[in-house]
Amino acid sequence: MIYFHNPRCRKSREGLTFLNQKNVHPEVREYLKDALALHELRTILDKLQMRPEELMRKNEAIFKSEIKGKKLTDDELIIKMIEYPKLIERRILVHGDKAVIGRPAENFMSILD
């Protein structure tokens, strides 16, 4: 089980606290320091059953300057997320063949039961 974490993000810290309070202690990966490989991000997207655009933080300045209004393919969007990991939505928990975005944190329980 892996929790993709940004320790500078309050919501990400809250998500990790939520898991720990439920006695769930995943491996923590600080994805801004330990960048995802292309195949890892594709696997996460498959497990989330999401398209790349759905996993992007659209309020980030980099989204507005590099992506908004452009017709990019899914592969191009994935490459942008690898290049600019701040674009990746926070609070992702991967467990086995499933993944979930913890917004709200209670969503984590859907793959832990």
What residue spans do the PLM features occupy?
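Conserved dinucleotide-binding and phosphotransfer motif residues
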Residues: 22
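Thiol/selenol-based redox catalytic cores and closely related redox-interacting motifs
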Residues: 33-113
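Local sequence-structure signature of Cys/Sec-based thiol-disulfide redox active-site neighborhoods
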Residues: 1-18, 26-31
